[in-house]
């Protein structure tokens, strides 16, 4: 089973002991495992192209957020000329080969830890590792790798990735260079993801892990703070495309969203403004305490920034998306 080395273990103890970080040891440890998985995945060769995306990409590649991110997200780009049956077979082969590649790299990936749906267009792998530090409540006990068949809509960037331990200690590392989704596309996808997932709260359903939801809020706010992307009016077209794609993808899981996505997202926007029971605020504070090692806007400020950007996008969209 994958675990960090003795040297890495001692580096973590030194960083925490010297007061160079307030992050729990378990967070730094998992980031090392995440980084090792990224390096291993970079060595995987397949006709399909993998693009690094999501919150971990924002943190480790774009460096626009200063937080621990424990999931690895990728877009898979296949040839557009493939027939549906050939695409399904190619994705199945990629899934199996990638799982074997990770196992050969020392990662514990049981057969039941590999799941796929929608004709293999969505693949999820749960890698198990052995922790040498106390558990952190905000962290899962495994590393989740998620891959979705979808070509990037905008331009990509080639960026290096590092571990938090390497960055904080100044220890030179073997950097992997990844093709990464751009900030604009990630920005829009996270706005839509936050609002869509917030619909659970409007129905009185509490998020099992609210900090999984508020990470989208935090990421959008940090991108907006440092890049002011929300002022780019060209993103309204992208916003509609992402909403429509999500409405198709989640049609069987959320009939209300699929029926009238813009109306549903406006309802979720109001839910953020009201935050009944302060569920989001409490989740945000826990997330900031356990996972963030950089600046942390107060929840009220973060909600205001996110709300303004989301409202501008929603107001630009037709009444029925």
Task: Annotate each PLM feature.
Residues 1-50, 60-66, 76-321:
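Structured mid-to-C-terminal alpha-helical surface segments
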Residues 52-56:
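Glycine-rich beta-strand-to-loop/alpha-helix junction loops that act as flexible
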């Amino acid at each position: 089973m994958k675990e960090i080395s003795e040297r890495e273990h001692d580096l973590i103890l030194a960083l925490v002991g010297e007061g160079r970080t307030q992050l729990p040891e378990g967070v730094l440890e998992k980031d090392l495992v995440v980084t090792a998985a990224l390096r291993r995945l970079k060595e995987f060769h397949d006709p399909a192209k993998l693009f690094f995306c999501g919150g971990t990409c924002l943190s480790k590649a774009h460096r626009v957020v200063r937080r621990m991110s424990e999931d690895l997200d990728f877009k898979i780009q296949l040839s557009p000329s493939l027939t549906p049956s050939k695409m399904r077979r190619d994705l199945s082969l990629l899934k199996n080969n990638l799982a074997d590649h990770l196992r050969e790299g020392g990662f514990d990936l049981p057969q039941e830890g590999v799941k796929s749906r929608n004709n293999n267009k969505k693949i999820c792998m749960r890698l198990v590792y052995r922790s040498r530090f106390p558990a952190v409540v905000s962290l899962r006990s495994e590393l989740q790798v998620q891959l979705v068949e979808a070509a990037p809509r905008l331009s990509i960037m080639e960026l290096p990735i590092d571990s938090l331990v390497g960055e904080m200690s100044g220890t030179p590392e073997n950097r992997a260079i990844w093709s990464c989704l751009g900030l604009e596309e990630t920005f829009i996808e996270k706005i839509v993801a936050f609002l869509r997932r917030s619909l659970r709260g409007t129905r009185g359903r509490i998020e099992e892990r609210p900090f999984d939801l508020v990470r989208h809020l935090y990421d959008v706010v940090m991108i907006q703070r440092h890049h002011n992307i929300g002022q780019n009016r060209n993103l309204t077209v992208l916003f509609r495309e992402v909403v429509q794609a999500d409405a198709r993808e989640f049609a069987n899981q959320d009939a209300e969203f699929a029926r009238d996505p813009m109306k549903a997202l406006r309802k979720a926007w109001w839910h953020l403004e009201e935050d009944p029971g302060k569920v989001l605020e409490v989740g945000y504070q826990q997330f900031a305490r356990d996972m963030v090692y950089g600046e942390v806007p107060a929840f009220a400020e973060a909600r205001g920034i996110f709300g303004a950007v989301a409202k501008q996008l929603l107001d630009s969209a037709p009444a029925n998306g």
